[in-house]
């Protein structure tokens, strides 16, 4: 049975009332439109749905606004939150007059990256295993006006609430700053909430394996089992969707901001990657039982600081990428060592041999981030880029002279965009990314840089008001 036939059968079996077609904007925010299920038949999956592309930031001008969404029948699932039974499906964006993929469609770049891998002859499939962290709060307020620039967060579980007064008393069990990794409840107060999130994902057909409290106060992570590049990018969007909505049902609010508060660890999105061509391409007899291709793949990722513009695309990303908070700052690699940008997780099975990029964060558009990482790695294999010797020391404690010899990740979104402007040819291979797409993306991100740089910050009042 075809994927379209499977989707239509699911609609019938589940007595679906509506079909929610979904796609992402360049920043990675999920967008949707809901159709009456009676309008969705076999032809719909081929002909798609017209929409106004000029209303999506960074896409079409109003005089060329018509765009078309083509549903991917292999991506369907039943929405767990809507009151009426609704089938959801992820879409690719195409030009209505030619039927060709729209050059700025993020999902289209992911699909093309997978096709490019196969066409290159290097591998048949790339597997991705992202690990996205997040914070759960009870109350978040912020203001950005000429007279007030401020934010305030609160959570009963927050380490700062040890002396707060509560109507039923302060029970005092909390994860302290940098003290949240793995204690049981009552310190881990979100056990049941995370369990509900994970169970919801299972009911949607997602492959999951675990959940736990993370290092920072109020910080958490759920585990996704690895899958194909586009599939896992879809899953990260579903992951965020479920977490936001389950938290909201319990009066909580979630953020995937990389660094929502000072003085504690930020949220990363570590990305595990492997390539298969009949067998695991990364298993071998080199360092850490890696193959030569795996080392070149690492070399490609470490060579390209411009990747940061796609894997760490927020001004806030670079408040996480600083020493002292378990975030990778140095462009180095090691087996098991978590202080470098790339880690080789220990495993007994050659089939599980993989590399882990530790610098990405969950503010990234997963389609663009995963495609960029794959393209950088493939560029490393094609050009046999040597990653240099592994760094098996604690990179956080290196003496200054050794530290100075190791290149770093970008220090700001401005720097990352400048690197991307200078060096992006590896992304253009196979037309996976296009110049038009990168230019549109960078224009949006430069707007964010200017907004951030031109807004006075409260700490500037603390440091300079009395000058």
UniProtKB/Swiss-Prot annotation:
Binding site for Mg(2+) 1: 131, 270, 356
Residues binding L-glutamate: 265-266, 320, 326, 338, 358
PANTHER family per UniProt: GLUTAMINE SYNTHETASE (PTHR43407:SF2)
GO MF entry, a single one: ATP binding
Protein name per Swiss-Prot or TrEMBL: Glutamine synthetase
Cofactor(s) annotated in UniProt: Mg(2+)
GS beta-grasp domain ranges (all copies): 14-98
Pfam families reported in the protein's UniProt record: Gln-synt_C (PF00120), Gln-synt_N (PF03951)
Enzyme Commission (EC) number: 6.3.1.2
Domain GS catalytic: 106-467
Keywords assigned by UniProt, alphabetized: ATP-binding, Cytoplasm, Ligase, Magnesium, Metal-binding, Nitrogen fixation, Nucleotide-binding, Phosphoprotein
GO biological process terms, semicolon-separated: glutamine biosynthetic process; nitrogen fixation; nitrogen utilization
Subunit structure: Oligomer of 12 subunits arranged in the form of two hexameric ring.
Superkingdom, natural source: Bacteria
Coiled-coil region: none
Cofactor note: Binds 2 Mg(2+) ions per subunit.
A GO cellular component entry from the record: membrane
Binding residues annotated for ATP, in chain numbering: 209, 272-274, 338, 343
Subcellular location: Cytoplasm
Regulation: The activity of this enzyme could be controlled by adenylation under conditions of abundant glutamine.
ATP-binding among keywords: yes
Function: Catalyzes the ATP-dependent biosynthesis of glutamine from glutamate and ammonia.
């Amino acid at each position: 049975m075809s994927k379209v036939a499977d989707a239509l059968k699911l609609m019938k079996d589940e007595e679906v009332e509506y079909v929610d077609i979904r796609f992402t904007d360049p920043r990675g925010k999920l967008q949707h439109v809901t159709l009456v299920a009676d309008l969705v038949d076999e032809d719909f999956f081929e002909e798609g749905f017209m929409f106004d592309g000029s209303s999506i930031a960074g896409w079409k001008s109003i005089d060329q606004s018509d765009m078309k969404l083509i549903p991917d029948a292999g991506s369907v699932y039943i929405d767990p939150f809507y009151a009426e039974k609704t089938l959801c499906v992820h879409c690719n964006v195409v030009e209505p007059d030619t039927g060709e993929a729209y050059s700025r469609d993020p999902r289209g770049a992911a699909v093309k990256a997978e096709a490019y891998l196969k066409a290159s002859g290097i591998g048949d499939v790339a597997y991705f295993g992202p690990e996205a962290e997040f914070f759960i709060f009870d109350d978040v307020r912020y203001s950005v006006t000429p007279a007030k620039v401020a934010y305030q967060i609160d959570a009963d579980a927050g380490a700062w609430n040890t002396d707060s007064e509560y109507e039923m008393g302060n029970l005092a069990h909390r994860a302290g700053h940098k003290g949240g990794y793995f204690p049981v409840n009552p310190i881990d107060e979100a056990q049941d909430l995370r369990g509900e999130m994970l169970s919801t994902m299972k009911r949607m057909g997602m492959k999951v394996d675990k959940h736990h409290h993370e290092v920072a106060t109020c910080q958490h992570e759920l585990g996704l089992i690895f899958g194909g590049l586009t599939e896992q990018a879809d899953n990260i969007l579903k992951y965020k969707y479920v977490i936001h909505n389950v938290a909201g049902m319990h009066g909580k609010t979630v953020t995937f901001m990389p660094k929502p508060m000072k003085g504690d660890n930020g949220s990363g999105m570590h990305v595990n990657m492997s390539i298969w061509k009949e067998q695991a391409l990364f298993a071998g007899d080199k360092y850490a039982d890696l193959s030569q291709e795996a080392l070149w793949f690492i070399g490609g990722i470490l060579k390209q600081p411009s990747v940061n513009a796609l894997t760490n695309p927020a001004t806030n990303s670079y408040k996480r990428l600083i020493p002292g908070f378990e975030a990778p700052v140095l462009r180095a690699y090691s087996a098991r060592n978590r202080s470098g940008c790339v880690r080789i997780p220990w495993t007994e099975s050659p089939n599980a041999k993989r590399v882990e990029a530790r610098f990405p964060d969950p503010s990234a558009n997963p389609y663009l981030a995963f495609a960029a990482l794959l393209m950088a790695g493939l560029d490393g294999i094609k050009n046999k880029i040597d990653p240099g010797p592994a760094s098996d020391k604690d990179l956080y404690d290196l003496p200054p002279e050794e530290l100075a010899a190791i290149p770093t990740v970008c220090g700001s979104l401005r720097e990352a965009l400048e690197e991307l402007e200078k060096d992006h040819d590896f992304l253009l291979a196979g037309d996976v990314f296009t110049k038009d797409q990168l230019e549109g993306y960078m224009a949006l991100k430069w707007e964010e840089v200017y907004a951030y740089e031109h807004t006075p910050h409260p700490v500037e009042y603390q440091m300079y008001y009395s000058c």
